C-alpha cells in the first residue's frame, strides 16, 4: 500500500526477487479456486477463443474466482472485468464459494448495462457457471455465455493477469492484522485499480476514466 500511495510501480517478478533476497514472506496465500466438478450442467462453447480485442465497452466480459487463505480461514473474490478498459464492472467478496456469490456479482454487473448492450461473459467450466440458475439469469439479462476449454487457463488470460497484479501489488507489499483488515485493504485496492491505477495501453488513464470516455463517445 505504501508503494502504491507513493505512486511507485514495480513488476511483480521484481517484488518476488527482492522479497526472496530479504527473506520476506507473503502472509496471505492466494490461489485459483478449483471450481470444476465435472459436467454438472451445460457447457457453453468457447466463443471468446482468446480474442481479447474490443471496439467498445460491454462487448466482452470475463470472470473467475480466486481464493485467499489467511488466519486459518478462506476468502473468495469473484469479479467481472470488461475487456475494453480492463474495468472492474462488479465483484463480490465472500466467505464461501457459493452460488449466490456469482449470482450477486452478475446482478451488480447487469445493472450497469446500457439499453441494448449484450456482452459475452467468459469463464472457466466451474460448477457455478454450469448451474441452470446462473445460465438462466445470463439469458434474462441478454448476456451470451462463453467458457474456456477444460484446464486451459490461457483461454481466460486477462483475468489470470488481473489476479497476478492483485497478488503482486497488494499481497506482497502488505501485512494484515485480521480477516477484516484484509477485506478492507482488498476493497481499497479494487477501488484504486479502477479509479486511480493508470495503464499505458489506456493512454495513461485508469480503467474507470477510459471506460467513461468510451461510453460518452459512443
Where are these regions (language model features)?
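Acidic/histidine-rich, metal-coordinating catalytic segments
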Residues: 115-130, 149, 205-206
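C-terminal domain-tail junction helix/linker
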Residues: 132, 139-143, 165-218
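Basic, flexible linker segments flanking DNA-binding modules
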Residues: 1-56, 152, 208-215
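RNase H-like polynucleotidyl transferase catalytic core
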Residues: 28-34, 121-125, 139-158, 174-178
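Mobile genetic element proteins and their domesticated derivatives, centered on retroelements
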Residues: 15, 19, 48, 64, ...
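Conserved, non-catalytic sequence blocks in retroelement Pol enzymes and Pol-derived host proteins
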Residues: 7-8, 53, 70-71, 125, ...
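An active-site-proximal beta-strand-loop segment
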Residues: 54-89, 95-96
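Active-site beta-loop-alpha junctions of metal-dependent nucleic acid enzymes
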Residues: 73, 92-115
Amino acid at each position: 500500500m505504501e508503494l502504491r500511495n507513493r505512486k511507485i510501480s514495480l513488476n511483480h517478478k521484481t517484488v518476488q526477487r527482492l522479497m526472496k533476497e530479504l527473506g520476506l514472506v507473503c502472509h496471505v496465500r492466494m490461489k485459483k479456486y478449483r471450481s470444476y466438478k465435472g459436467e454438472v450442467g451445460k457447457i457453453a462453447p468457447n466463443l471468446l477463443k482468446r480474442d481479447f480485442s474490443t471496439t467498445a465497452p460491454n462487448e466482452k466480459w470475463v470472470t473467475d474466482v480466486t481464493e485467499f487463505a489467511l488466519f486459518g480461514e478462506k476468502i473468495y473474490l469473484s469479479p467481472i472485468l470488461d475487456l475494453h478498459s480492463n474495468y472492474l464492472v462488479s465483484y463480490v467478496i465472500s466467505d464461501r464459494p457459493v452460488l449466490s456469490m456469482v449470482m450477486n456479482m452478475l446482478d451488480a454487473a447487469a445493472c450497469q448495462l446500457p439499453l441494448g448492450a449484450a456482452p459475452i461473459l467468459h469463464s472457466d467450466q466451474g460448477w457455478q457457471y454450469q448451474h441452470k440458475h446462473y445460465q438462466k439469469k445470463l439469458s434474462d439479462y441478454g448476456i451470451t455465455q462463453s467458457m474456456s476449454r477444460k484446464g486451459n487457463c490461457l483461454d481466460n488470460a486477462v483475468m489470470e493477469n488481473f489476479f497476478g497484479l492483485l497478488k503482486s501489488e497488494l499481497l506482497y507489499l502488505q501485512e494484515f492484522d485480521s480477516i477484516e483488515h484484509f477485506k478492507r485493504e482488498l476493497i481499497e485496492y479494487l477501488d484504486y485499480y479502477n479509479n486511480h491505477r493508470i495503464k499505458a495501453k489506456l493512454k495513461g488513464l485508469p480503467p474507470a476514466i477510459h471506460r467513461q470516455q468510451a461510453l460518452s463517445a459512443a
